Amino acid sequence: MPDMDIDVKDLEEFEATTGEINLSELGEGFLQSFCKKAATSFFDKYGLISHQLNSYNYFIEHGLQNVFQSFGEMLVEPSFDVVKKKDNDWRYATVKFGEVTVEKPTFFSDDKELEFLPWHARLQNMTYSARIKVNVQVEVFKNTVVKSDKFKTGQDNYVEKKILDVKKQDILIGSIPVMVKSILCKTSEKGKENCKKGDCAFDQGGYFVIKGAEKVFIAQEQMCTKRLWISNSPWTVSFRSENKRNRFIVRLSENEKAEDYKRREKVLTVYFLSTEIPVWLLFFALGVSSDKEAMDLIAFDGDDASITNSLIASIHVADAVCEAFRCGNNALTYVEQQIKSTKFPPAESVDECLHLYLFPGLQSLKKKARFLGYMVKCLLNSYAGKRKCENRDSFRNKRIELAGELLEREIRVHLAHARRKMTRAMQKHLSGDGDLKPIEHYLDASVITNGLSRAFSTGAWSHPFRKMERVSGVVANLGRANPLQTLIDLRRTRQQVLYTGKVGDARYPHPSHWGRVCFLSTPDGENCGLVKNMSLLGLVSTQSLESVVEKLFACGMEELMDDTCTPLFGKHKVLLNGDWVGLCADSESFVAELKSRRRQSELPREMEIKRDKDDNEVRIFTDAGRLLRPLLVVENLQKLKQEKPSQYPFDHLLDHGILELIGIEEEEDCNTAWGIKQLLKEPKIYTHCELDLSFLLGVSCAVVPFANHDHGRRVLYQSQKHCQQAIGFSSTNPNIRCDTLSQQLFYPQKPLFKTLASECLKKEVLFNGQNAIVAVNVHLGYNQEDSIVMNKASLERGMFRSEQIRSYKAEVDAKDSEKRKKMDELVQFGKTHSKIGKVDSLEDDGFPFIGANMSTGDIVIGRCTESGADHSIKLKHTERGIVQKVVLSSNDEGKNFAAVSLRQVRSPCLGDKFSSMHGQKGVLGYLEEQQNFPFTIQGIVPDIVINPHAFPSRQTPGQLLEAALSKGIACPIQKEGSSAAYTKLTRHATPFSTPGVTEITEQLHRAGFSRWGNERVYNGRSGEMMRSMIFMGPTFYQRLVHMSEDKVKFRNTGPVHPLTRQPVADRKRFGGIKFGEMERDCLIAHGASANLHERLFTLSDSSQMHICRKCKTYANVIERTPSSGRKIRGPYCRVCVSSDHVVRVYVPYGAKLLCQELFSMGITLNFDTKLC
């Protein structure tokens, strides 16, 4: 069926009609075409990195203001130094932050404001940042004691606040790095003007430029706050609030203070503010008046005798620690005593502690008591086996932290540091008699600026829960090998764990990952399963700004009673983002009304609604960090009756309920069809439907053709390694970039096949390689296993030819820099007669001219001092190239720096690595002349010959299917009934919906080829027809960055380590080749002892030492005078006082060094020697 579109107006008219339509009337082809258009609309709206941009934009618009407002009014007291102020007339001050404004990124040069773009920061080694200004109010006052009328006020004296001065001004508080393409970035506007300004054509932003380097946030998986965490080792239920990170824990444990025969009874205790309190005492401190009332709040409906005994034992424990706690405020007084007796007691009163730190989302103490009873009931139900414990590996219990949350936490830490410095500085002036200086004199703007820059540079960020700790792995360098690697880095997630401890099941896939996290894209090694990649349709929710509580009441929610007497039997709890906000009588109709209004955009589109029938709860989430994904709503697919062709945006699909964004908890109640085919078989049993199964994969897996036919490990290698190492087109603006190392393919091509993901994304740059004619054959034995043989003529015509651009950077201090140095010690750029290298290509300014051919030993950047000291940068061993560009500039730190880029053309040579898109990585083993290659009847000569043994062991039949499909696509097919009309077929190789083998073979047959892709070929050397047929077809191959020219190592003699006398390791320092344990074991297995002795001894650190055979100790070589009177030098045993039994042995110098080090520690070794 041809593709058909839906008209928006007709769709709205159709919604008014009634009556059900059978989905089979729409047709499978129409529904699949609609899914493709819906996915395209999704990518047009959200793209692939919207989660990075949305999080940062929300932080700039709302989160940054909340950080400053959270500090409230800060009181600054004087230092109370009686030496400075003897009259004790102390002054106080209060500081309050007001409105926060963030400016656009600008750069000032000679007091001139210049336009500042990301490529300026990259070239000038600067940070692409914007200045933060905040309105600060400073109030200076005195406290004076004034007498009052005791009969009117009840006090003899009271303290009167006398205001001395009030100032308001906008000050610079620091600078914040700007995310490229965010609302602060000047390149966020779409259009071709950005490309003219130097912006890359396919740069989507989402990263930062810190001191010239591109940095990206790795999304952090953190445990969700404001949720009940039930654990069975030991039995506890905990609640962690959002603002205050102090956990509130209810523990069910054995009563340690009871007598022995009662030891098995479990009691309920509460861990609150670093102290342990019996739960019954906390109930009465919150306003519960009787034991029956507390039991009704718990409302445990089981008949388990052990739980009943635990509740009774908990009452007895409360009676034991506090007598008469049911009377008056005795329970509250006991709680206050316990809190004040902790090591670090809070400054607030007990009432304030209960209000601020105990369930801060609930305002009254009665509601807090109800929530406490709800926690106790959940714990007891879990202990009785009626409720499951929480799974920490499930994404329902996690939130994704992105740029907004990470920057908010880091800025809060540095702002607190700046506040402490401000307080200490203001205290000194408040104690004196002089006026206070302007507030910018006390608030150091460099604290936030330098703190954020240090966090980005080092990668150490504030821990989410522990104040004094830092975590790593939050920020990473953005990969620029090709656009696909850039997208992978921007969609990566990470779970922070301690590798030394037990990780548990964190590395294994979880059912909650389905459709949100790619189940193949994960690295190997210690990060396996911990570093993940989001799936194509995975979307991270943002914080909802609109209040939904009133709308919940309109949908039938009842208000939570502010008492502890009214029973809640038959009512279902309604939790909004973890806070208990109300009740509902009929949860089924209430949830149905909520979903209906959400599908009509009366409620936030990203709202998640979960109905828990087992626990009688309705959980609603509108917070940020949840992983959502779009699904088709089956009951609304009847609106898609075929109408006139037209296009519509993704928002329209959400507004009319055809699609909806489903969260992890809500999807547990959905019955989702895997595809249109499965849906059409039984449409009545499904509530939702997938757009396509290939969207379950990540961006790197979804573009692999026939991925479902390959071994999972091979797809993992392609998605996690090969596609990120493939040489393509990294950017469209290489002339204004000075990356340390970049690769560019001369003639990148797009493959003949298509996948649904690449077609919906409209990104041909996701493929980095060329289409090569590949033959599966054994050729001269040079393509054993993974080796390949390539056509030399194809390489000479430019196949897989690339260029490598390496930049060398150096910086010097400007002459007018603040760092005072002697003129003869000031390093400057310039040409000097260097002793460390050749300066033939340098000009007088110390830089080479454009087009200069430089090789090993040449000076690439000349630097010297007035005294003649040489600080030049020299090309190391194997480094060479032609000078492409020279950049000289200065940054905002007063330093001049230069960058010289060398270009080197790389044509494939022996040892280079290539890979297909199926994980078939091979090393180029031989370059064969074209006339010696086998050729077909049509005269087609293959570009690459691979060994047939590479397929059974690696289990990649997908490559064979790709070659057969591409062969049919590339060749014209004659239409039936026409002798001259030809057309080209384009077929999709989308994973899980690929064409069948029969369909591919019929396509080859219609094109005039063998059904199974085999070709009759002739020997290029003899011209004879070969007996066996060879499978041949076009296959998309990638050239990897692993090239033999960068890895080949050779040396005869060279530098050795001064301590161990072994060859150094660095290749550029003429280092040796590593001979490790695996190589040693291999030679041992072959019995090549002479070769082993040569490698590990003769060619490494051969040495000799002397041993006394009598005392078996080490003999020294000393100069001594024997009885003859003439001095001689030789080995001598100091223990035996003789040289008669001394022999010479050959040992590695590393062993000799070990003996000497042990001897220096007082450890003597005995050696047994034997004459050979």
From Swiss-Prot:
Function (record text): DNA-dependent RNA polymerase catalyzes the transcription of DNA into RNA using the four ribonucleoside triphosphates as substrates. Second largest component of RNA polymerases IV and V which mediate short-interfering RNAs (siRNA) accumulation and subsequent RNA-directed DNA methylation-dependent (RdDM) transcriptional gene silencing (TGS) of endogenous repeated sequences, including transposable elements. Proposed to contribute to the polymerase catalytic activity and forms the polymerase active center together with the largest subunit.
EC category name: transferase
Entry keyword Ribosomal protein: no
GO CC aspect terms: heterochromatin; mitochondrion; nucleus; plastid; RNA polymerase complex; RNA polymerase IV complex; RNA polymerase V complex
Protein name: DNA-directed RNA polymerases IV and V subunit 2
Protein keywords: DNA-directed RNA polymerase, Magnesium, Metal-binding, Nucleotidyltransferase, Nucleus, Transcription, Transcription regulation, Transferase, Zinc, Zinc-finger
Zn-finger region bounds: C4-type: 1108-1136
Family membership: Belongs to the RNA polymerase beta chain family.
Phenotype of null mutants: Blocked in the perpetuation of CNN, CG and CNG methylation in repeated endogenous DNA. Reduction of heterochromatin association and methylation into chromocenters, coincident with decondensation and losses in cytosine methylation at pericentromeric major repeats such as 5S gene clusters and AtSN1 retroelements during interphase, independently of siRNA accumulation. Altered cell-to-cell movement of siRNA beyond the vasculature. Reduced 35S promoter homology-dependent transcriptional gene silencing (TGS) in transgenic plants.
Tissue-by-tissue expression: Mostly expressed in seedlings, flowers and roots, present ubiquitously, except in sperm cells.
Source organism (scientific name): Arabidopsis thaliana
Location in the cell: Nucleus
Single GO molecular function: DNA binding
UniProt-annotated binding residues for Mg(2+): D786
Alphabetical list of InterPro entries matching this protein: DNA-dir_RNA_pol_su2, DNA-dir_RNAP_su2_dom, DNA-dir_RNAP_su2_hyb_sf, RNA_pol_bsu_CS, RNA_pol_bsu_protrusion, RNA_pol_Rpb2_2, RNA_pol_Rpb2_2_sf, RNA_pol_Rpb2_3
Catalyzed reaction equations: RNA(n) + a ribonucleoside 5'-triphosphate = RNA(n+1) + diphosphate
EC number(s) reported in the record: 2.7.7.6
Self-association state and partner proteins as the record states: Component of the RNA polymerase IV and V complexes. Interacts with SSH1, NRPD1 and NRPE1.
GO biological process terms held by the UniProt record: defense response to fungus; DNA-templated transcription; gene silencing by siRNA-directed DNA methylation; regulation of immune response; regulatory ncRNA-mediated gene silencing; regulatory ncRNA-mediated post-transcriptional gene silencing; siRNA processing; transposable element silencing by siRNA-mediated heterochromatin formation
